[in-house]
Every structure is written in structure tokens, then in C-alpha cells.
Amino acid sequence: MRISIAAIGRMKTGPERELVARYLERAQGAGKPLALTGFDVFELSESRAGSAAARKTEEAKAIRAALPDGLVVALDERGKSLASEAFANQLARWRDDGRAAIGFVIGGADGIDPDLVRAADLTLSFSPMVWPHQLVRIMLAEQLYRATTILSGHPYHRGD
């Protein structure tokens, strides 16, 4: 199953970008024997439209165009919270059901277009708090890596 991340906004060169790259590189290595591949990031420009609603609509179009056909997971503070093990198991279920691709969506400063959130196969929350897109990208990359280690029995995850 090919995993992609579509994120509004570009990360500048620096420690945050390096951390995302490091976690996704590890996820690629650990995920390959599990048939979890890709771990691509599509950085999409923030819309310059005049209103928040118009910006979200434009950004949603760019997100849909960037992601391969497949499942969509929108990251939103109003979404469902999952423990790391439950997240890993959900990825495995989708893979075992024969899903070819999954795209994770990280919105911009205005959030994600409500129509895209409603159409998503899952709306996932890391917290009811709002986080900067750079931190969400780091947290998602880490959780994807953690999921691959949980599924492979690697000792990285030491949860209860």
C-alpha cells in the first residue's frame, strides 16, 4: 500500500524538515517488508484567495490533484484520536483489504475544506488542540514510522 502525505505549505530547510525526512526514510525501510511503500510528501502552495473559504476550496483542489486514487485521511483537531497501536492496526487492515494507496492530508493556516473532510475515509486528530502544519507533519511522520515498527515487532515502540 502506497502512503502519501499532501501538505499545504512548504517546510524550509532546517531541523524540522530533516526530522520529517529521517522518520519517513525509516518508515520506508521498515515498511517495505510489510508492503507499506512510498511515504511521499507533496508540498502544495498556500492559496492567495481573499477569503478563508475560497482558500480552503482552492487548496482542496490542489490536494485532490496531488494524491493518488485511494483512501484519504484528513488530519483535523475534530477528528478521531487513535492510540499508536490502533493506528498501526488500521493501516494493516486497509493494506490487508487490498487498498492500493492512502493519502494523509494536512491543511494550511485555515484548515481543510469541509467537503474534503466529509469525503475523507477517516478524520484523524492528534489532539483537540490546533498545531502548526510543520509540527503535524513531524508527528505524522513519526507515527507512520512507529506504526511500521509496531507491525514488524521492532522494539522502537515500547507502549503498554
Predicted regions and their residues:
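N-terminal beta1-alpha1 ligand-phosphate binding loop
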Residues: 1-31
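Conserved RecA-like P-loop NTPase ATPase core
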Residues: 5, 73, 107, 140
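Short hydrophobic segments within beta-strands
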Residues: 6-8, 42, 105
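Short glycine-rich anion-binding loops that position phosphate/pyrophosphate groups of nucleotides
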Residues: 11, 77-80, 108-111
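Conserved strand-to-helix beginnings and helix N-cap segments that scaffold or border functional pockets
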Residues: 17, 84-88, 117, 137
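S-adenosyl-L-methionine/SAH cofactor-binding core of RNA-modifying enzymes
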Residues: 35-102
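A mid-sequence interfacial segment
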Residues: 87-127
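Structured adenosyl-cofactor binding patch, chiefly the S-adenosyl-L-methionine
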Residues: 114-160
